């Protein structure tokens, strides 16, 4: 940092140079020194020298060598740093050097999360195939909107249950909560396989399986942050690629089973397809439990005097699991709002993507192929932006992908999405951009959160996201209720505007951190 760029009231002086300020004519009574300050604290020195007031921020040698900036809470649009080194993380005062940033154990943990997320996100990406089969078979007597509420409830329970596992993970670690979530996830799938009535599917799939899926999701997304800081975007992108892999493999497997027929049991293919999915998810989640281990110490909160064990559990894991105070942090608040609108947009668009295609004369098989293209292109869509985010900044790349997705929807899909050839291109672009959104948004949340609090903050965010998903899909269904061409155009506009609002929220969140200037953030 050049001394020419400093004003007399904001001088940064290395520790070894501080004696130069203490000339005989200084007013010694105006020098304040904290003898208890350690290597991580700064000393504030104010002196009167040659009739000029000088305020010096004195850093330890360790901090000077690291280029540390100790900053106050930023105001709206304020650029909180006078310089931004190319290799500095702008928003964190954590000991960056303590993160492994790689190594055998770190990548084994990432691979374990990858396997677990194949099961979690793979099921989420297979709901369209399951919905289509139920609409034509077990639930053929129910309306489309009624069946839609089943899957909307599944997504809500999945998102909302993250809040329980996130709090437990921060306090107790990975393994126990993963075992509990795996039991619910697999048991829900086996119960779904034998369901025949609407209320059966509500209990087995939406509630039990949705709860288990959400329970395992939060720890699997949180653990890579324990091993990576500078390369966190790349690591989480590698882990979440499992969602796209599952989104490609699971629907193909389920459609193959669903096509099986039996003279004595018309549900034979569905039953064994869901059971096979349950066995496969059990194997994947078990391997994840074996391979993954958290690194950072747990957040410990002792019980109060005279507090019973059950009152302690109720207070810590139920009443305090929602981090309401986090919303007082404006950068976190707008990050959550941005995630709500992005998830609402993408989930609503994908839920009715096949219906849109068939309404424009595209066959059911080709519509299924378009969905497969989205999932396949989501694989590089998760990795490439994740890698770029470590080079150019997580928020910067996330905002760029959201704006690109908005352009794809308004410039590509809305005017040209009327024939199969165009839809192939649109599906590829949409899959790439939406995949990057899913992998980058948790990283952005992690960047503005302490690592040991990430699980709770992430789960709190997705608890709120669950409400957005719960109402977003039915609203989209109401928009296309008549299924006219104009209805589907309004459906694209609705999803596109939600994407744009998401980008604006992330821009505001970034502004609270570093202002509007171009820096790597």
Swiss-Prot record:
Extracellular topology ranges: 125-143, 194-200, 255-269, 347-367, 418-422, 483-487
A GO cellular component entry from the record: plasma membrane
pH dependence: Optimum pH is 7.5.
The organism's place on the tree of life at top rank: Eukaryota
Record's bilayer topology term: Multi-pass membrane protein
InterPro entries (alphabetical): MFS, MFS_dom, MFS_trans_sf, Proton-linked_MCT
Assigned keywords, A-Z: Cell membrane, Glycoprotein, Membrane, Transmembrane, Transmembrane helix, Transport
Protein name as annotated: Riboflavin transporter MCH5
Designated gene of the protein: MCH5
């Amino acid at each position: 940092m050049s001394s020419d760029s400093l004003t007399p009231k904001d001088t940064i002086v290395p520790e070894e140079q501080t004696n130069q300020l203490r000339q005989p004519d200084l007013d010694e009574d105006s020098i304040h020194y904290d003898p208890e300050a350690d290597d991580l604290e700064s000393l504030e020195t104010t002196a009167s020298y040659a009739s000029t007031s000088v305020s010096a921020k004195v850093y330890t040698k360790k901090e000077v060598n690291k280029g540390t900036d100790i900053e106050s809470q930023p105001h709206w649009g304020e650029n909180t740093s006078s310089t931004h080194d190319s290799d500095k993380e702008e928003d964190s005062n954590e000991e960056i050097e303590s993160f492994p940033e790689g190594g055998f154990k770190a990548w084994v943990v990432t691979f374990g999360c990858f396997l677990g997320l194949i099961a979690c996100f793979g099921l989420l990406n297979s709901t369209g195939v399951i919905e289509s089969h139920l609409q034509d078979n077990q639930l053929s007597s129910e309306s489309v909107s009624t069946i839609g509420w089943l899957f909307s409830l599944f997504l809500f329970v999945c998102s909302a249950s993250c809040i329980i596992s996130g709090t437990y993970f921060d306090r107790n670690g990975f393994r126990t909560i993963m075992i509990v979530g795996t039991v619910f996830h697999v048991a829900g799938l086996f119960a779904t396989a034998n369901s025949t009535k609407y209320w059966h599917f509500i209990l087995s799939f939406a509630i039990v399986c949705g709860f288990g899926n959400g329970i395992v999701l939060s720890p699997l997304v949180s653990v890579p942050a324990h091993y990576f800081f500078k390369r966190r975007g790349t690591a989480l992108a590698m882990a979440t690629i499992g969602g796209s892999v599952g989104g490609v493999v699971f629907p193909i497997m389920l459609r193959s089973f669903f096509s099986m027929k039996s003279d004595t049991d018309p549900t034979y293919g569905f039953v064994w397809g869901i059971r096979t999915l349950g066995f496969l998810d059990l194997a994947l989640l078990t391997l994840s439990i074996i391979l993954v281990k958290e690194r950072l110490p747990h957040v410990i909160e002792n019980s109060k005097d005279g507090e019973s064990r059950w009152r302690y559990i109720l207070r810590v894991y139920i009443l305090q699991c929602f981090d309401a105070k986090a919303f007082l942090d404006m950068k976190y608040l707008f990050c959550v709002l941005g995630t709500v609108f992005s998830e609402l947009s993408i989930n609503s668009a994908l839920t009715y993507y096949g219906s849109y295609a068939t309404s424009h004369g595209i066959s059911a098989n080709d519509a299924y192929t378009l969905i497969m293209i989205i999932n396949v292109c989501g694989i590089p869509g998760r990795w490439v932006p994740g890698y770029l985010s470590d080079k150019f900044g997580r928020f910067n790349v996330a905002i760029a992908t959201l704006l690109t997705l908005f352009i794809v929807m308004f410039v590509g899909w809305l005017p040209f999405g009327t024939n199969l050839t165009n839809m192939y291109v649109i599906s590829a672009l949409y899959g790439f951009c939406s995949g990057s959104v899913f992998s980058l948004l948790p990283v952005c949340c992690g960047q503005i959160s302490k690592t040991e609090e990430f699980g709770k903050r992430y789960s709190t965010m997705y608890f709120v996201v669950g409400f957005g998903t719960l109402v977003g899909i039915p609203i989209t269904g109401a928009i296309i209720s008549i299924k006219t061409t104009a209805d589907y155009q309004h459906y694209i506009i609705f999803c596109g505007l939600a994407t744009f609002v998401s980008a604006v929220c992330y821009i505001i969140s970034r502004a609270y951190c570093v202002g509007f200037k171009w820096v790597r953030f």
